[in-house]
Amino acid sequence: MINQRLFEIDEWKIKTNTFNKEHTRLLESLTSLANGYMGVRGNFEEGYSGDSHQGTYIAGVWFPDKTRVGWWKNGYPEYFGKVINAMNFMGIGLYVDGEKIDLHQNPIELFEVELNMKEGILRRSAVVRIQDKTVRIRSERFLSLAVKELCAIHYEAECLTGDAVITLVPYLDGNVANEDSNYQEQFWQEEAKGADSHSGHLAAKTIENPFGTPRFTVLAAMANETEGFVHESFKTTEMYVENRYSYQTKASLKKFVIVTTSRDFREEELLSKAKELLADVVENGYEDAKRRHTDRWKERWAKADIEIKGDEELQQGIRYNIFQLFSTYYGGDARLNIGPKGFTGEKYGGAAYWDTEAYAVPMYLATAEPEVTKNLLLYRYHQLEAAKRNAAKLGMKGALYPMVTFTGDECHNEWEITFEEIHRNGAICYAIYNYINYTGDRNYMEEYGIDVLVAVSRFWADRVHFSKRKNKYMIHGVTGPNEYENNVNNNWYTNVIAAWTLEYTLQSLESISAEKRRHLDVQEVELEVWREIIQHMYYPFSEELQIFVQHDTFLDKDLQTVDELDPAERPLYQNWSWDKILRSNFIKQADVLQGIYLFNDRFTMEEKRRNFEFYEPMTVHESSLSPSVHAILAAELKLEKKALELYKRTARLDLDNYNHDTEEGLHITSMTGSWLAIVHGFAGMRTANETLSFAPFLPKEWDEYSFNINYRNRLINVTVDEKRVIFELVKGEPLHMNVYEEPVVLQGRCERRTPNE
């Protein structure tokens, strides 16, 4: 089902020549730009008085918004950390004969917007009427991958009907607010500002907070390159700086902005560093800055592009998702993680969730250098002490990683998530396994990984309890990945990943040095308890149905399938009461199937099939994380039609606004699912036991697909068509791997026939 498709189908661009004012926020989300350091929604430079969400976000710059709940519970975090809306540095006001152009008010005769994903450049043009004049607007902008602090804009305006005075007003505006502020407060205060005829700067600092969290100062410095103007001026007001240029009939301006923050420089250095970077960019010019930026995108696409022949819609979808993921994070700063919305909106506060470890890590392992993924792991390692504090607040030993965080301290303030969705601890440990298993970097375990594993294992050992009645260890009062159920007992996935963590920790302790083991103070009596828990963990199972049961009472519900739902009631979270959702059997996202996906090699094909056929028909996929896991398992089970249906949903989740919420921002971490569904799903890539293996098939609707993976200092190209799969070793040493369960030595080029259906 197509929900809200704004853009034409194009393999490398998202573009449209239609502007629907009802979908302005959706357009802004989908045309967002970022470079890992900062990001901006696709707002119009000249401003827009209609329904719009002006959004500028700086990586790692956040504020502790005081928690707002009706009933305070012991253990709640005092604040919800939020990436806050920073100053608008993109603005360029446009006036014709003194009257401001506004695409909400002025009649639009022509409108075009194009996001070029190959280049990372957003272009827009419009022809608008203002009084008796017709004016053409053209803009081009990018956030540089080569100079991360740089935003560059080329803006032009021309009167097409006679003479007119065109005025351009490039500005910096710190009068911004968060739409999701709990108490409608402003988070910024002015620190400094200044301007002259062709430049200006504005510095703002986050207001004081009672929680002792860091304050941040952000400075934006702009330089404007223009000529042919007949008048110029500048001014500064509270939290605002502008330059103003007036032209006869036609205007052209290049606006360069450098953004520096107190995360990287001392406050007294922010302006001098910005001016230094700005001078270098201006000296080399706009075209040089653009070339350096597009060259970086060329390098990234060479490693990570996925090509689909025979389906332009899905080709556009996968490239869009890769583009937005690499715009959000590329591993340059170990202090950063991947927020679910990236730099595209304020929902979820822009903080780190377990999505990163479960969904983003496997993609980045294969599409970027190992250091990119390692930095994601180090982010959690550096927050280990905070995770121990989180566990202590709940009266537990060991470490409990937060559901939502910037510093390692928990920011989420819903009890059923903060206190109960503890399976997140397992995802952090699984990412360590995934990284070491994929890269072979065993030093990571000794230096960093084992510290996390031991601390999390101590939490699990304390969180379980022993049921004398069943002679089993259990975990009560949890929320599994399916957040449409809370406070359940013995969530199968949680129990599985808890026991697996203990098992993996025991295994890993055997490989570390005696000195490290002494440092961790791991005693044999403690290890014996862990072994006992592993051996006697309880896993809900139905002998009758021969399935793993989601939790103790799941089968006592009124079991229905999704096709029994009235489509008008979807999505459930927008139409049902929370009470009704909790009592239903409908599943928001993979739960049991999440465990089968992660620990795939531990289950038989028949176990996978029975559980998939039982749970998938009950799954509403109202989490953006859901379709990809189901697509991967459907592909493995040779359910091609179902796999492709689910893949389409994950590939075009935002482009077609499947969940009716993309106007709030993109589903960044979920975008990894479109990559996973092709590589882990259709291509059947696995890395169990440090052995790379493939079992590809080609969906009947496609002619061919191909992709690259990085694997242990090798670059491998994989191409799958109707009759064969071709592996090409582009770079690196020969590799022993498996294809359709047969051993293969890859050196140069290797070709195998795909199995006949």
Curated annotation (Swiss-Prot):
The active site is at E483. GO terms for biological process: carbohydrate metabolic process; maltose catabolic process. GO terms for molecular function: carbohydrate binding; hydrolase activity, hydrolyzing O-glycosyl compounds; maltose phosphorylase activity. Pathway: Glycan degradation; maltose degradation. Pfam families: Glyco_hydro_65C, Glyco_hydro_65m, Glyco_hydro_65N. Disulfide bonds: none annotated. Keywords: Carbohydrate metabolism, Glycosyltransferase, Transferase. Its EC number is 2.4.1.8. Substrate binds at W354, D355, K588, Q589. The keyword NAD does not apply. Catalyzes the phosphorolysis of maltose, leading to the formation of glucose and glucose 1-P. This is Maltose phosphorylase. It comes from Bacillus subtilis (strain 168). The lineage of its organism: Bacteria, Bacillati, Bacillota, Bacilli, Bacillales. The gene is mdxK.
